[in-house]
């Protein structure tokens, strides 16, 4: 099954310029969907991504990438 990442292009805590290349590095074959994820409350304060329809968030992008990598290994 192919992994899917969904990220918001409008949330204040998310920097797509740095996050997208890192997600592609984690899984080059994953589908990446960019757009509003209706996760605005947490998205103001935390970096987040939906990984296979499950939200993953962290205070920093580095922490987020670590959490996503761990989730993909399961």
UniProtKB/Swiss-Prot annotation:
Pfam family for this entry, one: DUF1450
InterPro entries: DUF1450, UPF0741
Family according to the record: Belongs to the UPF0741 family.
Protein name: UPF0741 protein Aflv_2757
Source organism: Anoxybacillus flavithermus (strain DSM 21510 / WK1)
